[in-house]
Every structure is written in structure tokens, then in C-alpha cells.
């Protein structure tokens, strides 16, 4: 039997030095709609909800606010990525600190990263099999190509296995989305073939608790190498 979901600590939740998560709020509407206007994002989707329209994005976020309270421990969370301070500004501030012109608090303020909207990460029930959970991510293209998807995916899996006590978790992606499939393999998932997903066919991946425990003892570089070989 799956235990009741323990409450999450107060947001934002740190997934890594580069990534933090929080609940969506009304002020995220424009960022959410803007992300979905990008044809590179839309090309990867296996649903057709018109989130590029601000009114639809606003209703979606309002629904999430209710979802968070009705389904504690699961949800679609806003991802914020850290952008480092300008190098020249930082160097100037550090010199000023060394010269005694600014104090520690002001230097720390300059050194702090800027947190900017990066997309979302999700841990939700599978629509076609509500007893199961799936992880997902949707990121702005300027956040692609790094390790944010892995950082967020590992946070979601810790939540699913350690926080919620799940025995397995699923992942889905467009069959043509090789980048998403690779990310799922690096996280430890294994492909199971095609499966129905929101009225479409999607590539399905599965990860069990025992494999998760073994896989995530490996350094990430080893997981990357093994996932590439498995593909």
C-alpha cells in the first residue's frame, strides 16, 4: 500500500545549484505562454493544449493551484534556473570588497545568481493508468543541452521513491524525441515500447525502486555512458 504523501517543505525546493522548483503562480502566465509559442517546444509535445494563449495558460495555472492542495506531493512545478552574475560586475565588486569599499552583505548580493523561468517539471498520475505516476519536464529551448533535465528528474524520482514510497515510476515522450529518451535512460528508465498516452502513441519507459537504488549509486558520468550504449 502506498503511504500518504508527506508534506513538502516550504518552496522553493533546491534540485541542484542550478535549479530550483516551486508552485506555479498567476505571475507565471506570460512566461508559460511565451514558452509554448516556441515552435521547437510545440514540436516535442504529445498533447495539444493551447498553452500559448494567455487565457488558457492562466486557467491552467489556476487549476494547478487547486491541484496542489487536493493532491499533496504531486504536481507540475515551475522550474527556475540560476544565471550567474555578469563577470565584469562580479570582478569589480570583489575588488571593491577587497579594498573595503563594500561589505560582505553587498558582495553576497552581487554574487547571488539571478533565478529565471526555465519551464516545468512534473510528477503526476498517468491519465491512462491513474494508479501509476509519471515524471515529465518541459523546458525553454535556452535551457536545453545542459544538465537541468537530469537535475530535475533526479529530484522528481527522490520524491516518488523516497517521499511517496512508490514501487515504480513511468516516463513518456514522443517516439521521435531522442533527447528525451536519452534523458530517461540516464535517469535509469528502461524502454517498454509504445503505449497509449493522452489519445496518442508515445514511447513508454519504466523505472522500478530496486533499479533506481542500484542505478543512482553510480556516478553520473557512468550513467551517461551506459545510457548511450543502451541506445
Q: At which residue positions do the language-model features occur?
A:
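Conserved active-site alpha-helix within GNAT-family acetyltransferase domains
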Residues: 150, 176-192
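Conserved G/P- and acidic residue-centered "switch" motifs that form tight phosphate/ATP-binding loops
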Residues: 28, 147, 177
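Conserved acetyl-CoA pyrophosphate-binding loop and the N-cap/start of the following alpha-helix
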Residues: 143, 147-156
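GNAT-family acyltransferases
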Residues: 1-142, 159, 163-172, 187-231
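Generic recognition of short, well-ordered alpha-helical segments
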Residues: 116-118, 134, 148-151, 182
Amino acid at each position: 500500500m502506498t503511504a500518504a504523501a508527506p508534506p513538502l517543505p516550504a518552496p522553493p525546493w533546491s534540485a541542484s545549484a542550478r535549479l530550483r522548483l516551486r508552485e506555479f503562480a498567476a505571475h507565471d502566465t506570460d512566461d508559460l505562454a511565451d514558452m509554448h509559442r516556441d515552435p521547437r517546444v510545440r514540436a516535442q509535445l504529445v498533447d495539444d493544449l493551447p498553452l500559448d494563449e494567455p487565457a488558457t495558460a492562466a486557467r491552467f495555472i489556476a487549476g494547478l493551484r487547486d491541484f496542489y492542495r487536493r493532491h499533496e506531493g504531486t504536481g507540475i512545478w515551475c522550474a527556475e534556473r540560476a544565471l550567474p552574475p555578469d563577470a565584469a560586475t562580479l570582478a569589480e565588486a570583489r575588488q571593491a570588497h577587497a579594498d573595503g569599499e563594500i561589505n560582505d552583505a553587498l558582495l553576497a548580493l552581487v554574487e547571488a545568481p539571478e533565478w529565471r523561468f526555465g519551464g516545468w517539471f512534473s510528477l503526476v498520475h498517468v491519465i491512462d493508468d491513474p494508479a501509476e505516476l509519471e515524471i515529465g519536464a518541459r523546458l525553454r529551448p535556452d535551457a536545453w543541452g545542459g544538465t537541468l533535465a537530469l537535475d530535475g528528474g533526479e529530484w522528481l524520482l527522490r520524491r516518488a521513491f523516497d517521499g511517496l514510497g512508490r514501487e515504480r515510476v513511468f516516463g513518456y515522450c514522443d517516439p521521435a524525441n531522442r533527447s528525451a529518451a536519452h534523458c530517461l535512460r540516464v535517469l535509469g528508465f528502461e524502454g517498454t515500447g509504445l503505449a497509449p498516452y493522452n489519445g496518442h502513441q508515445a514511447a513508454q519507459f519504466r523505472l522500478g525502486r530496486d533499479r533506481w537504488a542500484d542505478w543512482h549509486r553510480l556516478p553520473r558520468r557512468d550513467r551517461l555512458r551506459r545510457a548511450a550504449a543502451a541506445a
